[in-house]
């Protein structure tokens, strides 16, 4: 009986420690989906000079991307970025003339960082945000490095 109680207490303690390993958060956009005129999506593997761009203008596609980001599970966790990572960026162009940028850096399978300097956050995610690029059925065109959402040094 004492062994069982000790084992139960140990399990409860371990579950509590695992639960404290990182609080899950969600993106709370400071704008509504109806405020988005278009979304510029950029992707490159390794070096920015290889960047490509797609521009999402259909209201249903904009709403789909907006909802996918709001439903993401993110955690405050430090992740080391690797050189030559795949980067997928999103620029939400809003009807008031401003924009909101998201940058996803894939550091491996189920290991990525989503950051926004306009939103002032940086989170870990195990979601494959890079796959959003392939889900957008639009033609990709070459993008200039100067067009890409900026990451401060």
Predicted regions and their residues:
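C-terminal motif of bacterial Sec signal peptides marking the signal peptidase cleavage site
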Residues: 15-19
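Function-determining sites in protein domains
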Residues: 20-153
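Positively charged n-region of N-terminal signal peptides that target proteins for export
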Residues: 1-6
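Repetitive helical segments and hydrophobic/amphipathic motifs
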Residues: 11-12
